[in-house]
A protein has these predicted regions:
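Aromatic/hydrophobic pocket-lining residues that form π-stacking "cages" and hydrophobic walls in ligand
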Residues: 26, 82, 109, 143
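Short glycine/serine/threonine/alanine-rich loop segments
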Residues: 35-36, 92, 118, 149
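General small-molecule cofactor/ligand-binding pocket signal
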Residues: 40, 95-99, 152
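Structural beta-alpha unit
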Residues: 1-4, 84-121
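A short acidic, glycine-rich active-site loop
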Residues: 59-77
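Generic structural signal for helix capping and beta-alpha/helix-loop junctions
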Residues: 46-47, 104, 130
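Small/aliphatic-rich secondary-structure junction motif
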Residues: 2-62, 87-89
Length: 155
């Protein structure tokens, strides 16, 4: 275990308590390993192309821009909570990212993590649509199934 190094960690957020609990674990691990931490929010929408929060405004249609603005408004408190939870003297570099896509949320998260060469993914057991009877939500289950790296599932 002494050889384990999580230099890049990603936590998937949707605003649910399990996802925010997962963020707390991700913060602790990122601080322990002095990792880069990305808090990712994926918005599933019926659009033709993928858009992310770093895209220039002129490339987005008005309706897409409105959806992105709403996603930013919705996720800002989550991202602020994560920033506030981090130790002030932490060496962790925090990134926040919003991606809108018509594709499956779990697929976007897995693809993004792989493209960014993430070493650890952290997810909550269930998201906002989570049924209490399910131990593991469909997004978390798919991430565990298809991830290229270890996945920590937080209950």
């Amino acid at each position: 275990l002494s050889e384990i190094n999580f230099s890049k960690i990603i936590v998937a957020l949707d605003g649910s308590e399990p996802s925010l609990d997962a963020a707390s674990y991700a913060i602790d691990l990122a601080q322990l390993y002095q990792s880069e931490l990305t808090a990712l929010y994926v918005v599933s929408v019926r659009i033709q192309d993928d858009f992310d929060s770093d895209m220039p405004d002129e490339k987005m249609s008005e309706s897409v821009r409105k959806i992105m603005e709403e996603a930013k408004r919705e996720s800002d408190p989550w991202f602020t909570r994560i920033r506030n939870e981090m130790s002030p003297e932490s060496a962790v570099k925090l990134h926040t990212k919003i991606i809108m896509s018509p594709k499956k949320v779990s697929g976007i998260i897995v693809d993004y993590a792989e493209n960014m060469s993430v070493d650890l993914m952290v997810v909550g057991t269930r998201g906002r649509s989570g049924f209490k009877r399910l131990l593991l939500g469909s997004v978390a289950s798919d991430i565990v199934t298809y991830a290229h790296c270890p996945v920590l599932v937080v209950k």
